[in-house]
Amino acid sequence: GYTGGSLNAITRSGSNQHKGSVFYFTRDQSLVGDGPEALGEPGEFSQDSYGFRLGGPISKDNIFYFVNAEIKSQDQPTGWSLSGNSGQCYGNCDPVISAAATRFENWLAQYNYNPGSRDENVRDIPADKAFLRFDFNVNDGNQLTLRWNYVDAGNVVNRPNSFTYEYPGEAYDFSSETNSLVGQLNSVFGTNMFNEFRLTFQQIRDRRPPVSIFPWVELEDVAPEAGYFGEFEAGSEPFSTRNALDQDIIELTNDFTWIKGNHTMTFGTSNQFFEFDNLFIQNAFGSYEFSNLEQLESGVAREWEYTVVNPGQPETQQFGINQIGLYA
């Protein structure tokens, strides 16, 4: 699902000394320890992460900067295959299961669709992050901070398991890009009063496209004659055919604190303004469910769905939510 929110994080900052560092981490299947034989050999995968940080003064004692960047790439196997070359083999590599898979794939080939390899699928999971911060000592009573945070992350989702074998072509690429900009002013008045003002703007763009374009096909009871009642699935994952969400969020917060003797009093306001643009059309390419191989090859679906937008209606829904808060 999706959610809207705002970002307020305590992070590193620069100082009067220039400091920096770089890093690199890596891991692959050769670093995986031995496990139960039933799990099979781990598929090929890789995890690489590298980046740097740098901070220091722009103007000594007055203006400081800090920048941080990280790039992460990860190739992660699903843990299941039909071929048995790596990971756990669906249906214990029973020849009856393999024969059923051949009939299923041949039926799909009639429509010029290849659902993907029988080998273990390796998913791509990238993540790029950047952070930039400036601190200004305006005067003895005021400090201004500007922060920018950026995240661009993806995740190819494909989840075969012991009951349902999802072919690689059923995967979808969930990606999320976030830009966040924060301005914060901390002020001190005398010895017993201070104020914190914060303005945040956040832009979030979520996308969920399928990796292949074809109606979703589910085959139940793939090999009942062998006592196996699992499922094959191929085609575009039905909830990802038309699925995207744009969020723009503005938050304005101000807290004034007054210390009087043994009492601390805070007066404030917190206000959030949300704008959403949501696209969700399930089964935009259609979906077909077949009870067994015979029904599949006869073209008799147990159930089918196809969703269209009413003529003249927009594909997306746009709406906003505002929250105003006062407290003491």
Name the predicted role of every residue range.
Residues 1-8, 12-179, 191, 203-207, ...:
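Acidic, glycine-rich flexible loop segments
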